[in-house]
Amino acid sequence: MKQSEFRRWLESQGVDVANGSNHLKLRFHGRRSVMPRHPCDEIKEPLRKAILKQLGLS
């Protein structure tokens, strides 16, 4: 899955996405995580799972 697709999916789940300097800041019901900003690249599965776990979406 591309990072841009994952970002759109997170936003559809209600995650607030804000731009950082070299990354995206993710917030969901008081939980926070970050994601590198490379929209054309594939997101690695361990990183995707870690972000979901940190946000409580897994």
UniProtKB/Swiss-Prot annotation:
GO biological process, one term: regulation of DNA-templated transcription
Pfam families listed in its UniProt record: HicA_toxin
GO molecular-function term, one example from the UniProt record: mRNA binding
Listed InterPro entries: HicA_mRNA_interferase (IPR012933), HicA_sf (IPR038570)
Signal peptide: none
Induction trigger: Induced by amino acid starvation, carbon starvation and when translation is blocked. Induction no longer occurs in the absence of Lon protease suggesting, by homology to other toxin-antitoxin systems, that it may degrade the HicB antitoxin. A member of the hicA-hicB operon.
EC number: 3.1.-.-
Nuclease listed as a keyword: yes
Entry GO terms, CC: toxin-antitoxin complex
Record carries keyword Nuclease: yes
Protein keywords: Endonuclease, Hydrolase, Nuclease, RNA-binding, Stress response, Toxin-antitoxin system
Assembly behavior: Probably forms a complex with the antitoxin HicB which inhibits the mRNA interferase activity.
Family to which this protein belongs: Belongs to the HicA mRNA interferase family.
Role played: Toxic component of a type II toxin-antitoxin (TA) system. A probable translation-independent mRNA interferase. Overexpression causes cessation of cell growth and inhibits cell proliferation via inhibition of translation; this blockage is overcome (after 90 minutes) by subsequent expression of antitoxin HicB. Overexpression causes cleavage of a number of mRNAs and tmRNA, in a translation-independent fashion, suggesting this is an mRNA interferase.
Name recorded for this polypeptide: Probable mRNA interferase toxin HicA
Organism (species): Escherichia coli (strain K12)
Organism classification: Bacteria, Pseudomonadati, Pseudomonadota, Gammaproteobacteria, Enterobacterales
